[in-house]
């Protein structure tokens, strides 16, 4: 109910006021949630029947990006080049009906070895407002999945209902997180490992993000460095888990002319990648989400079902 009211009145509330309210809520919540954010020790438990990462790597590194608005597309190539500088690959998720998604950009990224995913349908916050609403949007979402040859989905604002999401034609979903009490739907899955969601269609892999989102750290909390990312990453490596990050090119600036109040320097992201590559050289499996989904599915098909510890 509260979420429905929020998205109804949100268009009428000035952006600066929205940010002011969210920042104050986070400031209050952060003190209360210090024992579960950014690290929830429970989430580091190894799942039942877990197997080692491919090639005996110590942990998985998964880079994903949600392109929130049309202008964000203009920064995708710059962002991809930063990752290429370090020999890394990632996925870019676009919102099909919020802006015109550039087929030229999609083709460019695909040809460079990046993955394309579907991010919600129009990002209006209403996808999960009712089962009827969700099911009415399934045909369109599936249409874009097929048209883009995409196999992965992420809902707007990390809203999620895994029973409903399983009705999409996907191999994986990434609309959840291990722990994030600052999200509109704050129920984390409490694991830093991927897991299989079984359903009547066979199932799909769920890939929760495990590093805090950039918008939370740099826009709402106004941090100016990658220290929390690095601290959480080190903990994930220690546990042998999956370091999955979700960033937004929309909020990055690559030169001073693009600086703004809802921007943070792309150098912070570059700093994180440099840290990973230098400190953990040869120890990580940098997988595309679809590759990770196949890994999880193969384990499940071998009757070694990955189960979360409840």
Segments from the language model and where they lie:
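Active-site-adjacent pocket scaffolds in enzyme catalytic domains
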Residues: 27-38, 48, 140-244
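Structural preference for beta-strand elements that scaffold enzyme active sites
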Residues: 60-62, 89-91, 113-117, 152, ...
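Generic structural signal for well-ordered alpha-helices
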Residues: 47, 76, 80, 103-107, ...
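Membrane-proximal basic amphipathic "stem/tether" segments
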Residues: 1-38
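Acidic-and-aromatic substrate-binding clefts and catalytic sites of carbohydrate-active enzymes
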Residues: 68-74, 93-104, 124-135, 152-163, ...
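Conserved, mostly hydrophobic/aromatic
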Residues: 9, 66, 116-119, 153, ...
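C-terminal domain-boundary segment and adjacent tail
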Residues: 44-47, 229-310
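Active-site beta->alpha N-cap acidic-glycine motif
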Residues: 27-115, 157, 161, 221
């Amino acid at each position: 109910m509260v979420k429905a009211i929020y998205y109804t009145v949100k268009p009428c509330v000035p952006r600066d006021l929205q940010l002011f309210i969210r920042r104050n809520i986070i400031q209050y919540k952060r003190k209360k949630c210090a024992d579960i954010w950014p690290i929830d020790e429970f989430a580091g438990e190894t799942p039942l029947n877990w197997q080692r990462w491919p090639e005996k790597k110590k942990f998985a590194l998964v880079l994903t990006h949600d392109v929130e608005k049309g202008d964000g597309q203009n920064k995708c190539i710059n962002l991809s080049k930063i990752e290429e500088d370090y020999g890394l690959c990632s996925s870019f998720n676009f919102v099909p009906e919020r802006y015109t998604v550039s087929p030229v950009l999609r083709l460019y990224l695909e040809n460079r070895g990046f993955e394309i995913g579907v991010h919600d349908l129009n990002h209006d916050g209403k996808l999960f407002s009712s089962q009827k609403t969700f099911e009415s949007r399934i045909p369109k979402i599936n249409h874009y999945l097929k048209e883009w040859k995409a196999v992965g989905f992420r809902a707007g604002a990390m809203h999620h209902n895994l029973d409903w999401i399983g009705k999409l034609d996907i191999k994986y979903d990434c609309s959840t997180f291990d722990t994030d009490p600052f999200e509109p739907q704050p129920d984390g899955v409490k694991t830093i490992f991927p897991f299989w969601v079984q359903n009547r269609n066979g199932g799909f892999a769920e890939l929760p993000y495990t590093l805090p989102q950039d918008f939370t750290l740099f826009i709402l909390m106004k941090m100016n460095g990658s220290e929390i990312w690095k601290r959480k990453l080190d903990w994930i490596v220690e546990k042998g888990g999956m370091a999955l990050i979700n960033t937004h090119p929309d909020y990055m600036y690559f030169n001073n002319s693009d600086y703004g109040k809802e921007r943070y320097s792309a150098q912070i992201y570059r700093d994180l990648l440099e840290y990973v590559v230098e400190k953990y050289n040869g120890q990580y499996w940098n997988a595309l989400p679809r590759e990770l989904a196949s890994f999880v599915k193969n384990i499940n098909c071998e009757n070694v079902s990955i189960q979360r510890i409840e």
